[in-house]
A protein has these predicted regions:
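Extended, non-transmembrane interaction/recognition domains
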Residues: 42-48, 52-353
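C-terminal single-pass transmembrane alpha-helix
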Residues: 344-394
Length: 394
């Protein structure tokens, strides 16, 4: 009995050490709530505080700043934010900043795929159509509430544009949705692809719903993901594609994609990870899912384009590492985007070492039974034959 109590106490202490207190603030320090558009969340842990800034000003972006526990946000220069002014510091803290990182949906485009092979060819004449994110019309933020809650979410929805070149995308009430979520402890997301998250990570989702393709019915969609980080000393990232036999969390997907700095091991290291899959219906039916293929990773030369992430990280240069990764949706023979008019993709971004998925007890037990029973039968057969082997006739 005593041993059980000790075990429970140890588990409780470990859980409490990893758990964070979440507090959400919608448009902090902003007098005119209609012209702000920022969700700010603090995640207070036992050793540090993570400050999350989510916004679509300029481009959809998620900025994460790590500080000591006693360092607090003291002001936001909303005038500079509204004027897209990179020269003036936007966020000010009462104490030091340990590290900061960001993920930006820096480009979004439609690409022509006439052979339905999900192969993006940027050199093809009229092969791509970029959506100008600067002119997207975003609704008021949905969510961004909670004080001491176990989860905070915020959704940004664009349902129109000021660009005449792009207004056709929204002719069927189409929307572009940017959803962010953090949780106070570790676990797997309830929705496919059931990404593993920690209390030091955020989950980011991009959804393209009922858009009207402008390049014809044979097109797909792709986007550029810009990664920024000031905790990296060598300024470069590594992309890892690991194959696993375990698809219990993401049926039919046996690959994990991770972006991280292989030479960093400190807790300030920043990483991304996702499953290379895009779902084509609200129910996230496995049979309707398609690939989310990585095309290239290059230094993000254009990362200075204004958004909430560059508003902060421009003042952390020149030690900011950057990388731009192109991700394209589609699989060979999938019927293109217009078949379902739906595409959703998710990733996780966090501080610390890249978390490793572990095979669950369920899979271990099933594997043990699956391999163990045939082994027992084979061993029993060998023993039986050995014991009942007929004597050779003389």
């Amino acid at each position: 009995m005593f041993e059980k109590l000790v075990f429970i106490a140890v588990l409780t202490a470990a859980y409490a050490a990893d758990k964070r207190k979440l507090t959400a603030h919608l448009n902090p320090f902003c007098g005119d709530k209609q012209e702000c558009g920022l969700c700010y969340v603090t995640a207070e842990g036992s050793n540090d505080t993570l400050h999350y800034f989510w916004s679509v000003l300029g481009a959809p972006a998620a900025l994460s700043i790590q500080t000591p526990l006693d360092s607090q946000l003291t002001s936001i220069s909303w005038d500079a934010l509204r004027k897209h002014n990179l020269r003036e510091p936007i966020f000010k803290f009462s104490g030091p900043v340990l590290s900061s990182s960001a993920v930006v949906i820096s480009k979004l485009w439609e690409y022509n795929d006439p052979d339905n092979k999900a192969k993006m060819n940027a050199t093809m004449k009229n092969g791509t159509h970029n959506i100008d994110e600067r002119h997207l019309l975003w609704r008021s933020i949905e969510g961004c509430v909670g004080n001491g809650s176990s989860m905070v979410t915020a959704t940004f929805v664009a349902n129109g544009t000021n660009s005449t070149d792009d207004e056709g995308f929204f002719s069927r009430n189409g929307t572009i949705e940017f959803t962010l979520k953090i949780q106070d402890t570790d676990g797997h997301d309830t929705q496919l692809p059931h990404l593993f998250y920690t209390s030091s990570s955020s989950q980011i989702q991009l959804s393209l719903l009922s858009l009207s393709p402008q390049l014809g019915k044979t097109s797909q969609f792709a986007f550029e993901l810009t990664v920024l980080d000031d905790s990296s000393r060598n300024g470069s990232y590594r992309i890892s594609n690991e194959t696993t036999f375990d698809d219990e969390y993401t049926p039919g997907v046996f690959t994990n994609v991770a972006v991280f700095n292989a030479q960093e091991n400190s807790m300030s290291t920043f990483y991304l990870h996702w499953k290379p899959v895009c779902y084509r219906d609200p129910g996230r039916t496995v049979t309707l899912s398609v690939d989310a293929a990585i095309y290239n990773s290059t230094p993000a030369a254009s990362w200075w384009t204004f958004n909430v992430a560059t508003a902060w990280l421009a003042h952390r240069a020149p030690k900011v590492a950057s990388s731009a990764i192109s991700v394209a949706f589609g699989s060979e023979g999938d019927g293109w985007y217009q078949e379902n008019g739906f595409a959703t993709w998710a990733m996780s971004a966090g501080f610390g070492e890249l978390p490793q998925e572990h095979v669950s007890a369920t899979v271990l037990s099933v594997t043990s039974v699956g391999l163990g029973i045939p082994a027992i039968v084979a061993l029993g057969t060998v023993i039986y034959v050995s014991l009942h082997k007929p004597e050779p006739k003389l």
